[in-house]
A protein has these predicted regions:
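Accessory nucleic acid-recognition modules appended to NTPase machines
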Residues: 1-102, 107
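Short, glycine-/Ser/Thr-/acidic-enriched flexible segments
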Residues: 44, 97, 112, 121, ...
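Short, glycine/charged-rich beta-strand-loop motifs at protein surfaces that mediate ligand recognition
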Residues: 63, 115-119
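A structural signal for isolated positions on well-ordered beta-strands in alpha/beta enzyme cores
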Residues: 90, 114, 142-143
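Active-site beta-strand-loop-beta-strand hairpin of nuclease catalytic cores
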Residues: 107-115
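Catalytic cores of nucleic-acid endonucleases
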Residues: 120-163
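Domain-level recognition of nuclease-like catalytic cores that cleave nucleotide substrates
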Residues: 149-183
Length: 183
């Protein structure tokens, strides 16, 4: 099965995204861990899910996906922000047997490592993001969601806090410009 997935990746139909447990640059993917599979064509994603007819004329495609398509769309937008054909999306996992934590994407911007979470609901928990930020050398993170722009100061401990920028999904295509102005 793994060989078939690698062939599909070489044909640029999908991407196998391997995790890292690092919170500093350079990021090294752990190819011994299970990868996330990202289809590179959203139309194929909808086709294989059997949602073509239902999507035409529908204003809210997330209702079919119950929010799960949001991570795919944001991942696609992050890929468009680079001109490197070989660019890979990387996600973070906590390297611990007793705890599972995952941050959806780690995005590199001007030598900084930016944690990016994608949440479709407004009351989503951010425990994994907080775990990442406890050890990361960064004082801000990004959450893409289906709500208006807002900013939160998250207090992790007496000595550690970070700014969480809550961006509407449609800000993904201008993430670099947002970071340029705000960090």
């Amino acid at each position: 099965m793994g060989e078939a997935m690698r062939i599909l990746e070489k044909t640029m139909l999908l991407e196998l995204s391997y995790p890292t447990s690092s919170t500093i640059l350079p990021l090294l993917q752990d190819i011994k861990k299970s990868p996330k599979l990202f289809w590179l064509d959203t139309g194929l994603v909808n086709y294989f899910a059997g949602f073509q007819k239902e999507l035409f004329g529908n204003e809210d495609i997330s209702s079919f996906w119950k929010g799960k398509i949001a991570e795919h769309i944001i991942g696609q937008e992050l890929l468009t922000l680079t001109d490197k054909v070989s660019a890979k999306r990387i996600y973070w996992i906590r390297d611990s047997r007793n705890s599972q934590a995952e941050v959806d994407f780690l995005y590199q911007f001007k030598g900084m490592l930016v944690a990016v979470e994608v949440k479709s609901g407004s009351n989503a928990k951010l425990k994994s993001l907080h775990k990442f930020m406890e050890t990361a050398n960064c004082n801000f993170a990004i959450r893409f969601w289906n709500q208006p722009f807002s900013t939160d100061i998250i207090q992790l401990s007496e000595t550690k806090q970070y700014t969480l920028y809550n961006l509407p999904f449609y800000y993904a295509c201008v993430l670099d410009q947002f970071l340029e102005k705000n960090v």
